[in-house]
């Protein structure tokens, strides 16, 4: 049985497109746990379409972001590689092509940080540069 540690998370995405910058960020609570030598972060986020459960799985050189609920998607980040994911919503789906530039992580039960820099193509649209950072601290739930 996995032992879950309550955590408080801060998720921030900076998206750059033709000189414009959009920042999306939120704070939430969730859990940290280790399973088969991989670190997992689990949390819920409010999306325009409803509640989404997100699980982030971190292993050497790879991060997998799994979303379920109002939005369904498994997005894989591998340093120096391109991956394709389907972003599924109730009214349809989009294909996302991700080219990961870098992954940095420093994780333990008390606190941690994951930073991912990647280019993303949404369908046939142009490329956008994304920088996503997830930071957390343990034991701060009420």
UniProtKB/Swiss-Prot annotation:
Signal peptide: none annotated. It comes from the Bacteria. Transmembrane segments: none annotated. Gene3D superfamilies: 2.40.128.20. InterPro entries: Calycin (IPR012674), DUF1934 (IPR015231). It holds the Pfam family DUF1934. Forms a beta-barrel structure that may accommodate hydrophobic ligands. Homodimer. This is Uncharacterized beta-barrel protein YwiB. The gene is ywiB.
